[in-house]
């Protein structure tokens, strides 16, 4: 949702109910098998037939599941209590607004390590992960956005287009994300125990059942492994430079963390023609990758930790202090720094097996990211896993005119942005393949997430046959 986001339900505590409380009649359809929307659709089709326009009406109708999918066998990683294992499951039938997706690839997000590797309890058997990519196998009778056979991204951020947030231009905060409890089981274990999906997606499975609001059809020949990144890490980093903090040509950009999200932000800033891209990262191979993908400077936060903020401010000083000649900061100016800052490092959920930073809680990087944002600049917060609380000087917080953006996938507008990111990958402006360093099958999920937790791999993708 890596360094992703707590609002995705990534910790197993925010799984959500698959029913739609907006429509009482739809809820009743669970018992009658017929919903109000289905009846309205049928009435419209009948009217078109009487008018001699049946063919046209049918052409506009969505693809629907011809038969029940209940009982279909599949495998998934299931977390129950403090353990995770591959289980044989039986699918329940899908609802009128749900989409059945055969998973082909799923992104390995750092925040999911807590669920997969078992350092917290999950009360209800849960299929982990908050994104995935695959092919539509069946759709409910009221689904319009996707059709059977479509290649679809099941994104960590939904977009309904009709809720308060979507109508006010904030689809990254779509009310489907948090206000509904999508905790209805989508399958059963051998003993009949119901299984739910983390974040209503559950991407570590051969099948996903998602509301259409989470599904984005992508019309491209790009590999599934690359497209899976657009449901989480790659999209979050790109959006942080193009939506919340719209990086301007020639501007100074500072990025804390060179994991999958931070490196996506590097590529996004480069594609926006940033003048300077400074990356702070303790792991040597990740600093090297940042330079390869477009960073102009990389810094180890362990070097001169106390002077890191001042060093970055000096790098962003500009060619002159003459205010009447376009100078940024006159003598004694207190709010110097970068135009755009992205915090994508977070805290350590597990002890890394590589170089460590100066503060495993992640709070130091969070504070430093705020301190190196210039007055009037933009700070986007993408990472999760920080441990503890942080405070800021009241006067500076109120008067420095910094803009702080909480980064639900960097502010991505899924239906608008995913297709344009596809185009950027197709023409080489973004290198999605560069951040994939390992792929694993379903049987290798636990081993793959251990590598993610150790930070010995950069980007891990899980593939399904």
Where do the model's predicted regions map?
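Glycine-rich cofactor phosphate-binding loops and adjacent beta1-alpha1 units
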Residues: 245-249, 272, 293-403
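C-terminal capping/lid region of NAD(P)-dependent oxidoreductase domains
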Residues: 49-72, 322-323, 331, 335, ...
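Mid-domain Rossmann-like dinucleotide-binding core that forms the NAD(H)/NADP(H) cofactor-binding site
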Residues: 46, 206, 214, 219-306, ...
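Glycine-rich beta-strand-centered segment in the early N-terminal region that forms part
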Residues: 92-107, 116-167, 172, 219-221
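NAD(P)H dinucleotide-binding glycine-rich loop of Rossmann-like/cofactor-binding domains
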Residues: 114, 160-256
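N-terminal secretory signal peptides
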Residues: 1-34
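C-terminal substrate-binding/catalytic core of Rossmann-like NAD(P)-dependent dehydrogenases/reductases
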Residues: 3, 321, 335, 347, ...
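Short N-terminal strand-loop motif that marks the start
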Residues: 3-5, 31-133, 202, 206-210, ...
